[in-house]
Amino acid sequence: MHSAILILDFGSQYARLIARRIRETSVYCELHPFDVSPQFIREFSPVGIILSGGPASIFTNDAPRVPQIVFELGVPVLGICYGMQAMAAQLGGEVENAQTREFGYAELLTEPCRLFQDIKDRINSDGKPALDVWMSHGDRVNKLPPGFTAIAFNAATPFAAMADETRRFYGVQFHPEVTHTLQGKAILDRFVHDICDAGYDWNMPDYVEEAIGRIRARVGGDKVILGLSGGVDSSVAAALIHRAIGDQLVCVFVDNGLLRLNEAKQTMETFSRNLAVNVIYVDASRQFLEQLKGITDPEQKRRTIGREFVEIFQQEAAKIENVKWLAQGTIYPDVIESAGSHTKKSGLIKSHHNVGGLPETLRLKLLEPLRELFKDEVRELGLALGLPRDLVFRHPFPGPGLGVRILGEVKYEYTELLRQADAIFIEELRNAGWYEKTSQAFAVFLPIKSVGVMGDNRSYEYVIALRAVQTEDFMTAQWAELPYTLLARISNRIINEIRGINRVVYDISGKPPATIEWE
């Protein structure tokens, strides 16, 4: 049984980062909405609890509250930002609207305490330990609860962190989970290992054996069907399930005509030939392109592609006898997004291709062997299972494929042009050592024509946009500052080698305000 940290989510945009940072310390954790039941918290049996930040103010009538049981379990508690304010207010302290709101970098001076012991960025001129942290708050604690002392402060926030060492309750007004807080990882490590006494028992080799055992116990002798896309998540799920139950797994690979260059061939070779997985190949490219005719709205394209996949998958599943389980490559961020904590207050940005597409009419039991794992853990698992590194570290690819990388209507001609351009882009990034320096890179087809000169002739051809970003969590991203010589080489190759393209542009938009994908 793993030591486990419970993270209660109050709607913070950084909540899943907290979970990732805890996992990085080799400790298992789960993120759940703040309003889970007391019974759930008891049965979870955490060795420590973290209260996330959130957008609410403690002064509103419907302000989220910390379940009282959190303070009664006798385990350490760490409140972050709003979590600290809620803890202070509920334990007898006071919170006020800050006269000076703090958003961004701040320097804090710390007092001796267990949480910050030997953790500092420097010693200031007065001999006090200083921390560089990331703040994001409009309210602040102005009176500590009984039993607490101040353990960090600056001129704007006299109680920037607080501690009740006896009960092992701590609060920090800053965000230790973001990389801008330079010692944040060390602070979280101190909390989970030294204060919560969690063991270093979350590691991939052990997880592989545990996961195989769980799959065998659940599935027994039943057959399992899985929609294999060639992406990282479904590929790792297929490899893990196959390791557990062998030929009881049947994969269905649907070629929708919207895949990357040679993706279908590479996927079939990896799984059918090299790993001896039973894979049914379905070429439905004409069917998908026919259904997409005349559709220009991105959301409608996503829904159409999803609907067609479900219909084809159902048809293939009906041909297989004695299938009792449907396997999916759902990973932990998918679970978090669909849990309904902070999502209740957020608007739809894009429909998620892994959520809501389950064909319920199949009446199959659901098997999601990766639902506990973050993306970096899925990649680590893939390597442990012997999958090729190029596949495991392949950049994310949207479920609708090139359908949402072609702006407007999807046509066969456009898919061919885009496939070639994207392949050149990725090949040159790999050759220059930039592929693994970027988190995601791809080409986008713009259905507009521009005037050019090819030799002595005027040309009027299509435009390709290139997009490459660097990010830790895909919640925010910076455009990758690729060398000009590399961009020039990519542009020259695309224009010279692909008839129909005469202009290449590079997207230098960050996220926010832009999303990573164009549609």
Swiss-Prot record:
The keyword ATP-binding applies. CDD domains: GATase1_GMP_Synthase, GMP_synthase_C. One of its GO terms (molecular function) is ATP binding. HAMAP family: GMP_synthase. Homodimer. It catalyses: XMP + L-glutamine + ATP + H2O = GMP + L-glutamate + AMP + diphosphate + 2 H(+). Residues 4-201 form the Glutamine amidotransferase type-1 domain. It comes from Nitrosomonas eutropha (strain DSM 101675 / C91 / Nm57). Pathway: Purine metabolism; GMP biosynthesis; GMP from XMP (L-Gln route): step 1/1. Keywords: ATP-binding, Glutamine amidotransferase, GMP biosynthesis, Ligase, Nucleotide-binding, Purine biosynthesis. The active site is at C81, H175, E177. The gene is guaA. One of its GO terms (cellular component) is cytosol. Residues 202-394 form the GMPS ATP-PPase domain. ATP binds at S229, G230, G231, V232, D233, S234, S235. This is GMP synthase [glutamine-hydrolyzing]. Pfam families: GATase, GMP_synt_C, NAD_synthase. Its EC number is 6.3.5.2. InterPro entries: Class_I_gatase-like (IPR029062), GATASE (IPR017926), GMP_synth_C (IPR001674), GMP_synth_GATase (IPR004739), GMP_synthase (IPR022955), GMPS_ATP_PPase_dom (IPR025777), NAD/GMP_synthase (IPR022310), Rossmann-like_a/b/a_fold (IPR014729). Catalyzes the synthesis of GMP from XMP.
